[in-house]
Amino acid sequence: AAIQECSEEEDRPVVSGPLPMHWVPAGPDSRVREDNCALVLAEELQGLQQEYWWTWTGAKLGYGKYNEGLAIFSRRPVTGADSFYISGVRDFSNWKTRKALAACTADGPAFLSVHMGWWNDPEENFRGQMERLQKALRERKLRPQDGSDSFLMGDFNSPAAIRGEGRDMVLDLGWRDSYEDAEIKDSGITVPGNIDGWRDGEHTGMRLDYIWTAKRHRVLQSKVVLNGISGPVLSDHFGVLAVIE
């Protein structure tokens, strides 16, 4: 599972004791605060006697008080995790700062969590961020061209219905859209209307969130979850569940 804008409040204490389940730091300075979203989820999963490996990294300051970050939870043992900038801006106080989080597992697959900027942003556009991401993945041999079994997941801020922009760029780089490959699928809509960043027009619904695969897999189903129909609404973006053989 990949989570974006997985936040903690900057003024909360840092956890000093051991973290639940299998915590994998994404760098030498990795730490979490007591109200960290990923930490709360890890504690809940542990209470349900589930076993997961998890990692988290902070990326930027949101709304003046939240450290908005990225998280990955894996049922497969994670052997290592790291995070890296994909934006030209690297200022924690600038809300346009963007990072990626990567987790590699013991038996091969790598999982990546990202929160991309907008295609037409004059300061931090999608194309530049995607190019930096691809460069970092090339160094780690995690691109489709590297033969990697990678899964690239997150909020891409790129409506699937718009041609010639973010989604098409990712496709051109060799990634496969699991929604399109799915044998069973729903509408795919992950944002039902206007939210922050998309208030310049009326939007009846957009598919902004994706699970991309580096290799061709048999995708049995792609389903929108946490949308009030399949699970409660938890965010202004719904979740995406892919069943992959």
Stretches found by the model and what they are:
Residues A1:
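An N-terminally biased module of ancient metal coordination in phosphate/nucleic-acid-related enzymes
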Residues W23, R33, Q46-G47, E51-E245:
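Active-site regions of metal-assisted phosphoester/phosphodiester hydrolases
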